[in-house]
Amino acid sequence: MVNIPPAEELAGRVAVVIDVLRATTTICTALANGADTVVPILSPEEAFQVARDNPDRQFLLGGERKAVLIPGFHCDNSPLEYTEARVKGRPILFTTTNGTRAIRRAAGADRVYIASLLNAPAVGRELARLEVDVAICCAGTHDQFSLEDTVCAGAILEYMAGPDRPVETNDMGLVARELFRRYDGRLADLLHLSSHGQNLVRLGMQDDLLFCAQLGTLTILPVFTEGQVVLLE
């Protein structure tokens, strides 16, 4: 059974957290480019404190507020900034408006996967292999519905299913899957329609939007465990 539930309904289930624009896309990109770990942090103040308390870790500070760089941080929330040259071997303290809070809220699940359009096919196939009860947690924008996260949920559902493997889901899951089928092959068009996508374009972040709209460019499986996001071995 796959639901898109309230965050509190996660005990005994496998959760998938999605924030396409841009937190989970950026986390996936950083890990694919060799980052050691990504630690979701709730506030800039907490990030600064953790970095001060652990100077030997040489944390990279990444994140945003209102879609722009936090003063004193090394990187904002653009996946394009998390290059191999910048992140390889580095632990990252990461705080964003929506995504990192959603990841932390999902901690009560038995396992928490981090998904974006980049790795949605890989996550969907992994969930199909596991045959578990899944909760898809869309971060949205300020806890409100978002097109980009919903279409990513639909992509995961589509890749979970097969000719002999129907996926049982709730109504929101059905809507998500139909949205993906409608926009498969032109996901950038949908992200341009979304309110968050339009905001990024207004801020001059068109390249971020196009990057985040790519489907299936990564095969990694990031998981949130013991307070940090790492790649599943």
From Swiss-Prot:
Top-level taxon of origin: Bacteria
Disulfide bond residue pairs: none
Cofactor: Mg(2+)
GO molecular-function terms, A-Z: 2-phosphosulfolactate phosphatase activity; magnesium ion binding; sulfopyruvate decarboxylase activity
Catalytic activity, reaction form: (2R)-O-phospho-3-sulfolactate + H2O = (2R)-3-sulfolactate + phosphate
Keyword annotations of the record: Hydrolase, Magnesium
Keyword ATP-binding part of the UniProt annotation: no
InterPro entries assigned to the protein according to its UniProt record, in alphabetical order: ComB-like, ComB-like_sf
Pfam families linked to this entry: 2-ph_phosp (PF04029)
Listed EC numbers: 3.1.3.71
Family, as annotated: Belongs to the ComB family.
Name of this protein: Probable 2-phosphosulfolactate phosphatase
Organism: Symbiobacterium thermophilum (strain DSM 24528 / JCM 14929 / IAM 14863 / T)
